[in-house]
């Protein structure tokens, strides 16, 4: 996973874009309990795994890349738990709204497209434009040493970074030109069972 991120970072650095990598794979991440404490306090009730710090940093970020290894044909459980809590506790997605997002999946063989689909759901519900590349945002390899050998995958990461840069610059140019964001209607909350 880091090989793909590092390939993108090279492009970001070359274009003067600051990045920060936050790894969640090496520590336990609690899942969202939907206790709604964050709705009252603005912070998740769990405070020891970096989610609240990430949500705070997200306010100032211009774009996001969420990358995951693929386990059993889906993203890692940790990234799901992290993103569920980050998005749920971020004040109606305000920290993410109208900022480009990209999902990246790394696998030995299968499950990458299902993983990308799952991660892209976060972007859709938060009104985030989704960045794509010249192929699906995936790299293949069993080990970190294998990933750079996936020439098409590495090229896809470089092009993805270029597309993210372009999108972020377009949004910045729009702000400077006075183009307002859409006036989103207040969301209705409808249950299927009445």
Identify what each model region corresponds to.
Residues 17-27:
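A short beta-strand-loop structural module common to alpha/beta enzyme folds
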Residues 42-135:
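Helix-loop-strand module that forms the ligand-binding subsite of alpha/beta enzymes
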Residues 47, 129-194:
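Glycine-rich phosphate/pyrophosphate-binding loop and the adjoining helix
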């Amino acid at each position: 996973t880091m090989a793909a991120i590092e390939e993108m970072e090279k492009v970001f650095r070359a274009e003067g874009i600051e990045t920060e990598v936050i790894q969640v794979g090496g520590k336990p991440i609690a899942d969202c309990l939907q206790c709604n404490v964050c709705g009252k306090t603005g912070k998740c009730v769990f405070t020891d795994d970096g989610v609240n710090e990430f949500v705070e940093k997200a306010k100032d970020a211009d774009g996001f890349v969420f990358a995951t290894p693929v386990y059993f044909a889906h993203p890692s459980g940790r990234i799901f738990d992290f993103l569920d809590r980050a998005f749920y506790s971020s004040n109606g997605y305000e920290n993410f709204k109208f900022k480009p997002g990209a999902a990246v999946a790394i696998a030995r063989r299968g499950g990458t497209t299902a993983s990308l689909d799952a991660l892209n759901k976060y972007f859709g519900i938060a009104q985030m434009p989704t960045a794509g590349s010249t192929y699906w945002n995936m790299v293949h390899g069993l080990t970190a040493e294998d990933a750079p050998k996936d020439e098409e995958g590495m090229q896809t990461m470089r092009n993805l970074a270029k597309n993210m840069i372009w999108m972020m610059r377009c949004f910045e140019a729009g702000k400077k030109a006075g183009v307002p964001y859409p006036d989103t209607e207040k969301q209705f909350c409808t249950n299927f069972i009445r």
